[in-house]
């Protein structure tokens, strides 16, 4: 309920006035030599935020001095901009007034290998120039694609990640949701 109230409060504010700075959840690369992979979700802007989140992935290889943030953004796609955006914002920035929830936080040995697989999944995303709020493809379709392509992430997107099942074949699962086939 608190998230819903915060979303409604943000709904009446001009989007350019909303907080978009760092949330302090990503370790400082200047003092963190180890590799890092993080996945975030934040409520969307306006009334849609009652029902939906925007997700993204941030990676920092060993000894890197900065993060790389991967996400899908719809703004401008209809005018020829790519849907997949790189480094549009910091790794853990607020999403138009909403503090993101960290869904994945991997660090240390073996994470550089995972980062290489994440980058390969980003490059092979099947909808790099497409965006549609519902049913997808959207930011959650992208993040789900990477998660399915890199099972070591152990990514579990929330129910509010609308679009995560955009391409899936319908079928029952033990949890009663949609069948989510692994990436090939």
Regions found by a protein language model. Name each.
Residues 131-164:
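Active-site nucleophilic cysteine motif
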Residues 4-137, 148-149, 169, 174-184:
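Non-catalytic ligand/cofactor/substrate-binding and regulatory segments of enzyme domains
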């Amino acid at each position: 309920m608190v998230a819903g109230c915060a979303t409604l409060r943000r709904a009446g504010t001009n989007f350019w006035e909303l907080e978009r700075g760092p949330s302090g959840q990503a370790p400082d690369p200047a003092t963190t030599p180890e590799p890092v992979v993080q996945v975030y979700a934040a409520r969307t802007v306006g009334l849609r935020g009652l029902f939906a989140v925007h997700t993204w992935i941030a990676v920092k290889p060993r000894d890197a001095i900065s993060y790389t943030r991967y996400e899908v953004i719809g703004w401008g796609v209809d005018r020829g901009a790519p849907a997949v955006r790189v480094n549009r914002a910091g790794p853990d920035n607020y999403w138009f007034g909403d503090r993101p929830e960290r869904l994945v936080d991997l660090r240390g040995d073996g994470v550089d290998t995972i980062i290489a697989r994440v980058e390969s999944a980003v490059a092979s995303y099947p909808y790099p120039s497409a965006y549609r709020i519902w049913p997808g493809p959207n930011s959650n379709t992208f993040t789900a694609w990477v998660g399915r392509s890199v099972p070591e992430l152990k990514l579990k997107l929330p129910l509010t990640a609308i679009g995560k099942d955009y391409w899936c074949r319908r079928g029952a699962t033990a949890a009663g949701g949609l069948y989510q086939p692994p990436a090939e």
